[in-house]
């Protein structure tokens, strides 16, 4: 019996450090991890070089066969968005008119034919991330000042809840377009 290892594409940047850590350290998730910039992540997913990907939210409507699959995202809520909205990121800038709404900058998407067991294992890996955020910093490029890095992560809200889902659908329906940067920093 041949085991098919899912391929997971993730943007390699500060805000995804905990997710990457969770994927790398969850014993029940056997997956190939593709680290790249936002445009390459979208391309890998579009070309089926990735089964699951952390996709910039603005790109989701343009992807065929993509569905949001986990309870996690890279997002923010009104109380934490002040720091995020100071960024020069295109999606962050496009979100400014929606300033009172929570936002999801990136969501976990999978193709319709992705093995449900792989999605469940990813969900467990991301939950592991929630429980080991500080350890993720210690093993990252941001370990030089772990206290500051951990405090910076507090600006993000990683739970994809009903409010973010509704806000994201409102954003998509507004017709605003945002092209992800090639290098998120």
Question: Which residues are covered by each model-predicted region?
Answer:
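Domain-level signature for soluble enzymes in the chorismate/prephenate branch of the shikimate pathway
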Residues: 1-185
